[in-house]
Amino acid sequence: MSLFFHFGLNTFTGQEWGSGHVHPSLFNPTNLNATHWIHLAKVNGFNRVILTAKHHDGFCLWPSQYTNYSVRSSPWKAGTGDVLADLSAAAKLAGVDLGIYLSPWDRHEHCYGDTLLYNQFYLAQMTELLTRYGEIKDVFLDGAKGEGEKDMEYFFHTWFSLIHQLQPAAIIFSDAGPDTRWVGNELGLGASTCWSIYNSSLTPIAGIYNDPRYAAEGDPAGHEWVPALCDVSIRPGWFWHPSELPKSAINLLEIYYKSVGRNCHLLLNVPPNSSGLISPEDIQVLQGFTELRRSIFSHNLAINALLEASSTRGEGGGRGGTCDSQFSPYNVLKEGIYTYWAPEEYQSSWILYIDLQELVSFNVLQLQEPIQMGQRVSEFHLEALHQDDVWKRVTNGTTIGYQRLLMFPKVKSQHLKLVIGKSRADPLISYLGIYMDPVTIWSSIYDDTVLTSHFNATQVIHIITQDNSHTATSTATILEL
């Protein structure tokens, strides 16, 4: 997960898309503290931050030598400030990755519309950003542009080449890649089928809107590894506005299920306010979101389970699987993607049998594939053994990828089996988790919407600490198996 910081003149004007004509004197975040921003990211589980170094209005948060429309012309630090330098230093000290957002659309620069001149201008500013501020791990290229604006041809592939030359480890995001792609909405909503495999030639960068489903779902027959990114703001707008309130912690948890839990990267925008700090109400929500994740996912209810597999590579085609074999089914209880269960080759049935050793109540399934070996599974389901010895399907899905989270009505059972129905190659599973989430409404996860919660963070944590049998936050039917 990454944090997005939308910050600039819009923070002081109440606008989302600035005109490019607002005077720089309005920019004066007197208490700006980049260390505070980075600390907030790190303690809440976000290992990367991205700053809007230049948004559509053209105002630069660093003292660019190619324009006067920057912090150099503002009263902040008497024109000597550099937001990106402050953020870079804080990120390096904390071990947090840094990314930059440089808007292609520029409403201030007069040469915008002149293809050759503006592309030269853009490359010059990109060079500044990629050579002054240490290691840059992410470059975010926004495809937004207002109607009626000047025609402009962007030299995307020239930009990509420059980025890879100056920052070889940087991931480049645009609507269609080349390294990560947009999921197609700003709700934090990933597709229920999501392949990290893609064919960018089928969706040119400017043509993603012609086939939004392809962009969201990816392509099992694709030739490139281009994972999907889900971006969403903690507030109604992308920039801070004093009249707006943040989403609730449960809202963010629902988004987590539908983004990270659907093989997507979550980029959550938390905009600094006009003083240069993250607002207290946003901090409270982030802390609540973190506590929710920890309380639900910190203990795998299957951690002490007995496991068997329909087959295990290197042990023949029969059911079983020892604890110490290289591809043991017990590998799915170890965190990390470099240990995994692998079935014998050329099998037509792939099943993991799970004995929890006692009756356990749960409503969340977590699965992971070792993606360094590619994304393989295209159909799976989980079954639980009924008390009259009848197997009953609990949930099912299509793709897994780096992580899949499925929520369903509460189940109580001891014996489970994970059945892989279809796979592009022999399926490999690196992790399997079973959890109890007592606060999220199952129907909101099943439906592709983000609901407004009536619980605040304090109430949520209180609910989680109660016995699950007394929790009244879910309207889902309980399946007693």
PLM region spans:
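Extracellular mucin-like PTS segments
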Residues: T458-A476
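Activation corresponds to long, low-complexity, non-globular regions
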Residues: I283, I445-I461, I478-L481
